[in-house]
């Protein structure tokens, strides 16, 4: 049995970045850049008005001064006239500040006169006010997005602003999902008293689809070697194959045996973890196989701890870790076993800090506990007891937020 940290190191060592590919900008969201991106222009590309108002020479401005309005400038048009002493140009937000002007007076601090041929300035203004200077955001040639950056809405906007209608990103892995167990029935069927619906396939697919799109539920299979073997062989066409169930020590836990029969190299099959001890990771060729415990909370936790970081590594992410919040424990926790625990928990902000309490649960089969949680409280294997008021770590995950 190995530690959580050592298991994750093995997984990340074996998960390799996928080759880069070029995609259209509109299809890049959620992917990671394979190359750094430099700006091909200054941003803003010109001295830009930050307000609706009047472009003026600051030295002219004193309360109640009257200026001649020489033109009106709107966004998308080039000024035709230079502002001289005693003059002003009416200007709109986003428009080019005309030559000669060194400040913009807000429209609410002015009074138009003589049918907009003149303007009275009601307030003194300093040089440079309400002007976004050329290149103050980004200079031409500057790296605006680094290699490994995840493309979100804001990065998409930057890519468009620097003229990229296509970008080079890392490919995403294909993911196949298999659930095993005689007790499982299709979710459209009403289970008999000794059966349960196959929820794991769908929750795993939902977790995977938060970061990749090529996710396929390959099916449910009984505790039968030949059936398991056949479906695993189909699943090995995927970059990552995830199985749930059939990995404990029971007479009908057959997944590990079938994987070995198929020539899968197993790197670990037990992790010092609760829930999720019987977690298996292996490879056949360049295909990665995760065989996760069948209890729903165990399945959820082990996906977050091992599968998600692996997917991120393959996609070119530079960071694979979940965010950690330090919070004050509201109630004492009894620690039963010397294994690291990840327990469904509820975080709440109080003042400038956080407080956390465990969600009541009935063990790793209690899927409903996850619906009430917004984090996983981490109980270190080195801790003997946790008292109310102790500071603890809580792992955040997109799947719970």
Segments from the language model and where they lie:
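Short beta-strand/loop turn elements enriched in aromatics
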Residues: 23-25, 46-67, 103-116, 347-370, ...
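Short, glycine/charged-enriched hinge/interface segments at domain edges or termini
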Residues: 2, 54-216, 360, 396-398
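Flexible glycine/proline-rich
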Residues: 2, 21-26, 30, 34-35, ...
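Helix-rich terminal scaffold detector
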Residues: 4, 165-292, 296-302
């Amino acid at each position: 049995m190995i530690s959580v940290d050592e298991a994750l190191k093995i997984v990340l060592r074996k998960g390799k970045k996928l080759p880069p590919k070029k995609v259209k900008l509109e299809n890049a969201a959620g992917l990671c850049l394979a190359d750094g991106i430099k700006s091909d222009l200054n941003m803003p590309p010109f001295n830009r008005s930050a307000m609706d108002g009047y472009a003026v020479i600051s030295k002219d401005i004193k309360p109640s001064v009257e200026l001649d309005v020489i033109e009106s400038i709107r966004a998308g048009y080039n000024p035709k006239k230079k502002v001289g002493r005693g003059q002003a140009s009416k200007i709109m937000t986003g428009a080019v500040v005309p030559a000669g002007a060194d400040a913009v007076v807000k429209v609410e601090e002015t009074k138009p006169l003589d049918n907009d041929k003149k303007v009275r300035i009601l307030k003194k203004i300093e040089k440079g006010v309400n002007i976004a200077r050329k290149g103050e955001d980004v200079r031409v040639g500057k790296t605006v997005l680094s290699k490994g950056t995840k493309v979100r809405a804001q990065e998409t906007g930057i890519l468009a602003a620097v003229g990229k209608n296509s970008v080079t990103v890392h490919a995403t892995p294909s993911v196949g999902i298999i659930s095993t167990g005689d007790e499982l029935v299709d979710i459209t069927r009403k289970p008999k008293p000794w059966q349960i619906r196959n929820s794991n396939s769908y929750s795993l697919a939902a977790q995977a689809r938060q970061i990749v799109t090529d996710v396929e539920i390959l099916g449910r299979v009984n505790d039968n070697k030949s059936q398991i073997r056949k479906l695993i062989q189909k699943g090995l066409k995927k970059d990552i194959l995830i199985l749930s169930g059939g990995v404990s020590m029971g007479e009908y836990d057959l997944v590990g045996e079938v994987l070995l029969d198929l020539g899968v190299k197993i790197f670990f099959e037990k992790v010092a973890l609760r829930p999720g001890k019987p977690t298996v990771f292996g490879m056949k060729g360049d295909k990665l196989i995760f065989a996760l415990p069948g209890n729903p909370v165990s399945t959820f936790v082990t996906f977050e701890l091992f599968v998600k970081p692996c997917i991120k590594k393959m996609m070119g992410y530079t960071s694979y870790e979940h965010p950690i919040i330090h919070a004050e424990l509201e109630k004492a926790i009894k620690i039963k076993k010397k294994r690291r625990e990840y327990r469904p928990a509820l975080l709440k902000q109080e003042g400038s800090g956080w407080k956390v309490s465990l969600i009541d649960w009935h063990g790793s089969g209690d899927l409903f506990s996850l619906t009430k949680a917004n984090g996983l409280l981490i109980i270190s294997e080195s801790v003997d007891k946790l008292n109310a008021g102790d500071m603890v770590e809580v792992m955040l995950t997109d799947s719970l937020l």
